[in-house]
Amino acid sequence: MSPQTETKASVEFKAGVKDYKLTYYTPEYETLDTDILAAFRVSPQPGVPPEEAGAAVAAESSTGTWTTVWTDGLTNLDRYKGRCYHIEPVAGEENQYICYVAYPLDLFEEGSVTNMFTSIVGNVFGFKALRALRLEDLRIPVAYVKTFQGPPHGIQVERDKLNKYGRPLLGCTIKPKLGLSAKNYGRAVYECLRGGLDFTKDDENVNSQPFMRWRDRFLFCAEALYKAQAETGEIKGHYLNATAGTCEDMMKRAVFARELGVPIVMHDYLTGGFTANTTLSHYCRDNGLLLHIHRAMHAVIDRQKNHGMHFRVLAKALRLSGGDHIHSGTVVGKLEGERDITLGFVDLLRDDYTEKDRSRGIYFTQSWVSTPGVLPVASGGIHVWHMPALTEIFGDDSVLQFGGGTLGHPWGNAPGAVANRVALEACVQARNEGRDLAREGNTIIREATKWSPELAAACEVWKEIKFEFPAMDTV
């Protein structure tokens, strides 16, 4: 060891283990406009003070490690460290705390959701001093938002491309999700689009399996949507799932979709990964493709109330990474979603500015500085009787997607699509006339059945179907 190294070590370095809170708990800290702010729900192990637990989260997700290291002296840790700056107990929960952590912007690569999540929700989630840890919300500073392209096109550009205004868009996931041949799959697409839907959709499971290879599916679906367009005079789309085992194969599928001239492709952004999603999003903007995002695997991450990551964080990450639609729950269908919480992250997807509102689970005020908005997609266990509630809850800037609620119609696929389109048009007209959809919804649907035998048949089939379970996702 050189004399210079010996002097440095003996004067400034003291080996050993220090409490995290001595360095990373800074209640006097005033956050900067450029900081990324995180709200963690922390459940410490018995005997671990909340200050130490919050400081440990800040340390392990930024510059800290389990022991003092001499290389700390080679940089300015005060500039780069995360700081736990506020802690509050969770009302009604024993030994749970919301710990607020501020991260300097220099810790993160520009335009990379992958890098942001690798730090903030990385190894710290396996830390032994914590029984559980959940990331409830993030404040993305304007300076960081502007390093991302965001959604390929956004809500207004999509409406202009489709020439459809003043109502929610209607979709349908083709069922059965697996097992159909490409030609039969295309037939179902055609029947649904001809019946009045705006979109049909590949199920998230559909990639390129032995029973239906991706190229065959793309060709038959393109033929179906062009035929439906010619017969209805409306622009139609089918979400062609470009998700693949490699980024190269994913891009090959997106390029082929563009060559076919279709308006939209699809990606499973969590299973596919944020790097792949951002790559595809950039391609879609450059080549005029809309991008539909499915959130398969989200409940593995977000459903447990005390561990993981809330979907509002995944939604913000998607708006940065890029997507024009994303599935967001229904409030009224078969999948998880409490109304105020769901509308909280729906607003985060669509609006340019969202105020802090803890009653809706929004921990931070968020500005998107004109980043395009994302259309929320309501999908999962919904049918014509849900149409008034969906129209009232989600408003015009949404996609209402009925899979079984279209293809399960007793008369077939096209009548199922007709029933949904008639129900939607009736609800939009009633709303525009000043009627209360929440109170008069069933009456509005019954009135519309007089003019649509397809809707009457659908109402009869699904009149008793309900999914009534308590929501796990509460404030």
From Swiss-Prot:
**Misc. remarks from the entry:** The basic functional RuBisCO is composed of a large chain homodimer in a 'head-to-tail' conformation. In form I RuBisCO this homodimer is arranged in a barrel-like tetramer with the small subunits forming a tetrameric 'cap' on each end of the 'barrel'.
Residue numbers binding Mg(2+): 201, 203-204
Q: In which residues is substrate bound?
A: 65, 123, 173, 177, 204, 294-295, 327, 334, 379, 381, 403-404
UniProt xrefs under InterPro entries: RuBisCO, RuBisCo_large_chain_AS, RuBisCO_lsu_C, RuBisCO_lsu_C_sf, RuBisCO_lsu_fd_N, RuBisCO_lsu_N_sf, RuBisCO_lsuI
**GO molecular function term, any single one:** ribulose-bisphosphate carboxylase activity
Q: Which organism is it from?
A: Spinacia oleracea
Which PROSITE patterns does the record cross-reference, listed alphabetically? RUBISCO_LARGE
Q: Which residues does this entry assign to the site Transition state stabilizer?
A: 334
**UniProt name for this protein:** Ribulose bisphosphate carboxylase large chain
The catalytic activity of this protein is classed by the Enzyme Commission as 4.1.1.39
Per its UniProt record, the required cofactor names are:
Mg(2+)
The encoding gene: rbcL
User: Keyword annotations for this protein?
Assistant: Acetylation, Calvin cycle, Carbon dioxide fixation, Chloroplast, Disulfide bond, Lyase, Magnesium, Metal-binding, Monooxygenase, Oxidoreductase, Photorespiration, Photosynthesis, Plastid
Alphabetized Pfam families for the sequence: RuBisCO_large, RuBisCO_large_N
Biological function? RuBisCO catalyzes two reactions: the carboxylation of D-ribulose 1,5-bisphosphate, the primary event in carbon dioxide fixation, as well as the oxidative fragmentation of the pentose substrate in the photorespiration process. Both reactions occur simultaneously and in competition at the same active site. Binds to abscisic acid (ABA) which has weakly inhibits carboxylation and more strongly inhibits enzyme activation.
